[in-house]
């Protein structure tokens, strides 16, 4: 039980964020704190020299918005613009937290930051961001994008439109970005937000959540979550800061915002890594090829793959497959069978990435195969290995390559030993290397002897996948 009203446990935080992921309703709100590891020096440090230029001491100023206004008044707006461009154009390398956020199925990002770190992270993860910084960009669009990034305070490329001075805040919602508040209100009503690096001291944001609370009353506001660093014993004025933090957590709870406290910022990365890992484990890479089906007859081997793919789809997993000979077509059949029976879209359950068979226009097939395998595997969390033989190879080299890539990308490998070929080789290697009890349990479950009963084999493999998607974290 928590002393502070509005504080949540790590387990509850992850569970609620996963619910939002499952319903495709997760949004992220990114504040300046997330950019500090990338080189952002904090607003106080940013304004230290400007304050000295106008005869002030930043340490004696509690209102940095007013300080920015004084500097703008004294040195003209272009000086503020140069300050923004000089600081934020240097932030070019996304942090680990930005990278992890880009791997989650988040289609809506809001940020008060001027930098391009989240956009860059999305692009590096093969996603197209659509950045919106002004009202004209809010109207309907046919743009092909994977995520919208709303920049509440503007962008480094147009510093003259950035919100930083008192005058900028006064004009926000009236002369500039008139519609941004309404769009943010809509997203706060329909999505579950995770706030990271955000201080909740921004007047524009506080206006929006205050308006929603009044319109809906506290009982009907949607739940959102934030992660903050706990005030530490060694901090100056510890008792005062601790009391203030507790009061802030209780106050945020009025707006439906629940807080998880970390002792160090590295814990944020750990939480995001857990979320990414658990999300990826809902996507399963099936690796394999089969010129022959080991101890199975051809018909039984084909039915085994069909039934396994059907049951994985039935349990809500998405399958990725490279359409290897003797395996891919029956993976497709199994998923298609499920989707037709349950009136579902096959794209929601299956991604096929076949390998080109012949070179054209001088394409290097080996290079293309490697890139194809990388793209297949990097989005998955579990790899199931079936059979793995070819007409001229008892142990298919391509399946072994996929095993090495799976390890490189951190997938949990589930080789089915009794299907023979590369899968048996991978089983022998994996069981010698792993020490994680959960993974060992899953591999043992998947490889229980069933005396050729493919229905029982399929049941055991699906159960192994469920073990790897355990509730504990």
From Swiss-Prot:
Annotated GO biological process: defense response to virus
Substrates-to-products reaction catalysed: NAD(+) + H2O = ADP-D-ribose + nicotinamide + H(+)
Positions of region (SLOG (STALD) domain): 283-473
GO molecular function, one term: nucleotide binding
Residues the record marks as active site: 153
PROSITE patterns (UniProt xref): SIRTUIN (PS50305)
Reported impact of residue 254 to E: NADase no longer activated by 3'cADPR
The enzyme's E.C. designation: 3.2.2.5
Keyword Transferase: no
Outcome of swapping residue 166 to E: NADase no longer activated by 3'cADPR
Protein keywords: Antiviral defense, Hydrolase, NAD, Nucleotide-binding
Domain Deacetylase sirtuin-type residue range list: 3-282
Stored SUPFAM superfamilies: DHS-like NAD/FAD-binding domain
Entries under InterPro entries matching the protein: DHS-like_NAD/FAD-binding_dom, Ssirtuin_cat_dom, ThsA_STALD
Residues that hold 3'cADPR according to the record: 288-289, 355, 373, 390, 398, 402
Activity regulation information from UniProt: Activated by 3'cADPR. 3'cADPR activates the NADase function of ThsA by binding to the SLOG domain, which changes its tetramer organization, probably allowing NAD(+) to access the active site.
Family to which the UniProt record says this protein belongs: Belongs to the soluble Thoeris ThsA family.
Recorded domain comment: Has an N-terminal sirtuin-like domain (SIR2, residues 1-282) and a C-terminal SLOG (STALD)-like domain (residues 283-473). Dimerizes via the SIR2 domain. The SIR2 domain probably has NAD(+) hydrolase activity. The SLOG domain binds 3'cADPR; binding alters the protein conformation, probably allowing NAD(+) to access the active site.
Functional description taken from the UniProt entry: NAD(+) hydrolyzing component (NADase) of the Thoeris antiviral defense system, composed of ThsA and ThsB (maybe SEQ_0762). Has a low NADase activity that is strongly activated by 3' cyclic ADP-D-ribose (3'cADPR) and weakly activated by 2'cADPR. Upon activation binds and hydrolyzes NAD(+), leading to cell death and inhibition of phage replication.
Binding partners and assembly: Homotetramer; with a core of two SIR2 dimers flanked by SLOG dimers at both sides. 3'cADPR binding is likely to induce changes in the orientation and position of the SLOG domains.
Name this polypeptide is given: NAD(+) hydrolase ThsA
Protein species of origin: Streptococcus equi subsp. equi (strain 4047)
């Amino acid at each position: 039980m928590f002393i502070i009203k509005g504080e949540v446990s790590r387990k509850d935080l992850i569970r609620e964020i996963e619910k939002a992921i499952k319903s495709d309703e997760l949004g992220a709100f990114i504040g300046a704190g997330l950019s500090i590891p990338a080189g952002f020096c904090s607003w106080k440090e940013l304004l230290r020299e400007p304050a000295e230029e106008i005869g002030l001491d930043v340490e004696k100023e509690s209102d940095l918005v007013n300080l920015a206004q004084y500097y703008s008044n004294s040195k003209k707006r272009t000086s503020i613009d140069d300050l923004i461009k000089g600081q934020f154009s240097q932030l070019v390398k996304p942090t680990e937290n930005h990278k992890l956020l880009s791997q989650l199925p988040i289609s809506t990002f809001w940020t008060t930051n001027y930098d391009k770190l989240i956009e860059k992270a999305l692009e590096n993860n093969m996603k197209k961001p659509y950045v919106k910084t002004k009202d004209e960009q809010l109207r309907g669009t046919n743009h092909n994008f994977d995520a919208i990034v709303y920049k509440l305070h503007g962008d480094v490329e147009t510093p003259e439109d950035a919100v930083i001075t008192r005058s900028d805040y006064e004009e926000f919602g009236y002369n500039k970005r008139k519609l941004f508040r309404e769009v943010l209100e809509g997203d706060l009503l329909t999505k579950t937000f995770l706030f990271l690096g955000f201080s909740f001291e921004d007047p524009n944001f506080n206006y929006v959540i205050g308006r929603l609370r009044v319109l809906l009353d506290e009982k009907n506001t949607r739940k959102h979550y934030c992660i903050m660093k706990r005030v530490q014993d060694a901090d100056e004025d510890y008792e005062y800061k601790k009391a203030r933090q507790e009061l802030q957590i209780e106050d945020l709870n009025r707006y439906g915002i629940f807080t998880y406290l970390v002792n160090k910022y590295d814990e944020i990365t750990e939480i995001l890594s857990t979320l990414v890992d658990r999300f990826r484990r809902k996507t399963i890479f099936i690796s394999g090829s089969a010129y022959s089906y080991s101890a199975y007859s051809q018909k039984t081997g084909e039915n085994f793959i069909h039934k396994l793919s059907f049951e994985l789809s039935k349990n809500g997993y998405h399958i990725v497959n490279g359409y290897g000979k003797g395996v891919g077509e029956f993976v497709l059949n199994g998923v298609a069978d499920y989707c037709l029976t349950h009136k579902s879209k096959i794209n929601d359950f299956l991604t096929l990435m076949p390998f080109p068979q012949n070179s054209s226009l001088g394409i290097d097939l080996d290079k293309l195969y490697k890139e194809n395998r990388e793209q297949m595997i990097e989005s998955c969390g579990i790899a199931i290995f079936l059979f793995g033989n070819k007409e001229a190879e008892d142990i298919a080299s391509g399946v072994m390559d996929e095993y090495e890539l799976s390890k490189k990308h951190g997938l949990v490998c589930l080789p089915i030993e009794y299907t023979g070929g590369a899968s048996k080789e991978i089983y022998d290697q994996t069981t010698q290397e792993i020490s994680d009890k959960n993974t060992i349990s899953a591999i043992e479950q998947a490889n229980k002897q069933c005396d050729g009963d493919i229905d029982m084999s399929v049941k055991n493999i699906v159960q192994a996948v469920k073990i790897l998607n355990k509730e504990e974290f």
